[in-house]
Curated annotation (Swiss-Prot):
Residues in coiled coil: 59-108, 152-673
UniProt subunit comment: Interacts with SCN10A and clathrin. Identified in a complex containing SCN10A, clathrin and SCLT1.
Protein name: Sodium channel and clathrin linker 1
Residues modified as Phosphoserine: 681
Species: Mus musculus (Mouse)
Record keyword Coiled coil present: yes
Function field: Adapter protein that links SCN10A to clathrin. Regulates SCN10A channel activity, possibly by promoting channel internalization.
Keywords of this entry: Acetylation, Coiled coil, Cytoplasm, Cytoskeleton, Phosphoprotein
GO molecular function, one term: clathrin binding
GO biological process, one term: cilium assembly
Residues recorded with modification N-acetylalanine: 2
């Protein structure tokens, strides 16, 4: 199991390294993309980078599927282990119930046994039965010790299996936590790509808007230039006409002088000249009207110039507003930096709290392990001490029984002797009564015999009292032994309850540990969210500042160009337009070259990613084979657990059999003692 876990960890580390490399590549790509945006590439490089990022999701999806399969298998194993635990608990409860039932049945059978059937058995048979029962007791004790040893070994093996399961569970939790982190990172990258898309769209919109405004202004400027040209042409025509009219007026004046000289001679011609003068006056009026129109057009041009000056002032005001916005963006950036510093401080505090919590967890683990070890040691010591005490008590009881049996045999011999002496004395008394009264010596003999009889009766009474006291002592010893047995059972039950309570405490501690882990995960997520918010704020501030600076620079450049165009002549504007066309052609060529390079790099990356996909598929196949091996090992472990359960059941059966044998032996001893007492009482009655 440990080797398989190490292999899984190595493979997961490799996959994490590959993902980190991809992430680092994309992070290094972003500033190049921004530089290309600032130089003139703007949207195309971002589109190419996004197309490159679109090749990553299949790898990530396969990795997530593989992790989900592993998590499902872990949940299946957890459920299976829980079911096994429940089955073990049910088996233990059934064994206890059967043990109690057998004990009650044996006690009832022993109580139902009839007494007084074997009163006339011999003492030798009783001794043999006692010896056989003692041997059975010794064998039962040996089997009990052997069963306890096997039970301890089985419990140790179960503890080792539980430790392995806990280690596997902790590693699975670590895998899940790392998977969550990776998913969060992927979500962050996706959000960043979306934001870059939005930023690119905004930049494109601003560029389109700026181009539209530039084209509109150029159109207006061209219209104004056309109007100026037309006005200048009209002025030139009007000036030429005025010159012509002045020349005509001079010629007319000369002609008038000539005509004044020739008035008298050319009266007929005066009417024609008057007509011509009227025509000339009408033409002059027309020229004057044209001059008025030209003056009005000049006034219109002056008003247009004033409007342009107003627009320039408005643009200057907008520039000042944009500068104010720039200062506001800088202040916002400063605020975001302060927020970042506060977030870093909170993060450090959270890390310190996490370290303290980890130290507290380690302390709790140590204390719990010490408590469990102390409880186990105490339980073992108490069991061993109680076992030794019971063994000592059993040996003492055996010694006392042997001494009491010896005393009983001696006392029975004395009683038999006293009975024989009594019979002999009674026979002698009968002989004396038959023969009649004899000498005083015979009378003395009778008195001595009578005193002997009295002494024998006294000794008989003393022996009976001693027998009663011995029987009472045996009863007290039996009562004490039963009380001590009950106390030992109570102690064992108390120890079992203590063990169960400690197990519950361990479960409660594990739950608290899980809660603390969840709290730590939540805190880490909050810190990551704060970091993300701070980074997003920084990025937004930087983007705003860069966009504002770019806009200001573009606007300033545009205003300068407009002013220069208004001041310069048409030639400069044509030259600038040619330069702009050449620059656009150059940028278009550059974009084409960059797109070719990016397509080649994308194809190379796609080929490398395909090779990595094939490698990862091989890794997944290896992982599947390892999972099959793990499943086989789990099946083997289940078989071992079943074998241990069978061994435990056998041990419990042997323990129950040993207890039944001990109970039967104790009952047989009690029956034998009762039979002996009854035999003694019957003998006494017969003698009386």
């Amino acid at each position: 199991m440990a080797t398989e876990i190490d292999l899984l960890r190595d493979q997961k580390d490799k996959l994490n390294d590959i993902l980190r490399q991809h992430q680092i590549e994309h992070i290094f790509r972003d500033p190049t993309m921004q530089n290309s945006m600032s130089k003139g590439g703007r949207g195309d490089t971002l589109v190419d980078s996004i197309n490159e990022q679109s090749s990553l999701p299949p790898l990530i999806a396969e990795y997530e599927k593989h992790l989900e399969e592993l998590n499902r298998q872990l949940t299946y194993y957890q459920k299976h282990m829980g079911e096994m635990k429940l089955q073990l608990e049910t088996v233990i409860t059934e064994n206890e119930r059967l043990h109690s039932k057998l004990k009650d049945a044996v006690e009832k059978q022993l109580e139902a046994l009839p007494f007084g059937t074997g009163i006339g058995n011999d003492i030798c048979a009783d001794d043999e039965t006692v010896r056989i029962l003692q041997e059975q007791l010794q064998l039962a004790n040996q089997e009990k010790t052997w069963a306890l040893e096997l039970w301890q070994t089985a419990s140790q093996e179960l503890q080792s299996v539980q430790k392995l399961y806990q280690e596997h569970m902790t590693e699975a939790q670590i895998h899940e936590f790392e998977n969550r982190k990776q998913k969060d990172q992927l979500n962050n990258f996706q959000q960043l790509t979306k934001k870059l898309h939005v930023a690119n769209e905004n930049i494109e919109m601003t560029n389109h808007h700026f181009l539209k405004t530039v084209t509109e202004q150029n159109m207006e400027i061209e219209k104004l230039r056309k109007h100026l040209r037309q006005a200048r042409l009209d002025l030139r025509v009007a000036v030429s006409k005025v010159e012509e009219l002045t020349k005509v007026t001079e010629g007319l004046q000369e002609q008038m002088l000539k005509k004044e000289e020739d008035i008298m001679s050319a009266q007929g011609k005066e009417e024609a000249s008057d007509r011509r003068v009227q025509q000339l006056q009408s033409s002059i009026k027309q020229l004057e009207s044209r001059l008025c129109v030209a003056i009005e057009e000049a006034d219109v041009l002056k008003t247009g110039k004033s409007n342009l000056e107003k627009q320039i002032k408005e643009l200057q005001a907008k520039c000042s507003e944009s500068e104010n916005e720039k200062y506001e963006a800088i202040s916002r950036a400063r605020d975001s930096m302060q927020l970042l510093e506060e977030a870093n401080i909170k993060q450090n505090q959270i890390l310190l709290e996490e370290k303290q919590k980890e130290v507290d967890r380690e302390k709790m683990k140590k204390t719990m392990s010490q408590l469990i070890q102390d409880a186990a040691i105490k339980a073992r010591k108490e069991v061993e001490s109680t076992k030794k005490q019971y063994e000592i008590l059993i040996s003492q009881l055996k010694e006392e029984l042997s001494t009491l049996q010896m005393d009983c045999d001696e006392k029975q011999g004395q009683i038999d002797r006293a009975i024989r002496g009594k019979r002999a004395v009674e026979e002698e008394l009968e002989k004396i009564y038959r023969e009649g009264k004899q000498d005083e010596s015979d009378y003395r003999k009778l008195e001595e015999m009578h005193q002997r009889c009295l002494a024998a009766e006294r000794s008989k009474d003393d022996l009976q009292l001693r027998l009663k006291s011995a029987e009472n002592r045996i009863k007290q010893l039996e009562i004490n032994s039963s009380e001590e047995m009950s106390r030992s059972h109570e102690m064992i039950q108390k120890l079992q309850t203590v063990l169960e309570s400690e197990r519950e405490n361990c479960g409660f501690v594990s739950e608290q540990r899980l809660k603390l882990q969840q709290e730590n995960e939540q805190l880490q997520k909050e810190t990551e969210d704060l970091r993300k918010v701070a980074l997003e704020a920084q990025k937004k501030a930087k983007l705003k500042v860069s966009t504002m600076e770019h806009q200001f620079s573009i606007k300033e450049h545009g205003f300068e160009v407009q002013l220069r165009e208004m001041e310069d002549s048409n030639r400069n504007s044509i030259v600038e337009l040619r330069h702009l066309l050449a620059a656009q052609q150059k940028t278009a060529n550059r974009w084409k070259e960059e797109t070719k390079k990016l397509t080649e790099s994308a194809e190379m990356r796609i080929s490398s990613l395909k090779s990595e996909l094939s490698r990862q598929k091989l890794h997944t196949q290896e992982l599947l084979s390892q999972l099959e091996m793990a499943n086989e090992k789990v099946a083997e472990n289940e078989k071992l657990i079943l074998e241990h359960q069978e061994k435990a059941n056998r041990l419990q059966r042997r323990l129950s059999q040993a207890e039944e044998r001990a109970a039967s032996a104790s009952q047989q001893l009690s029956v034998i003692t009762v039979q002996r007492r009854k035999a003694a009482s019957m003998m006494n009655l017969e003698n009386i």
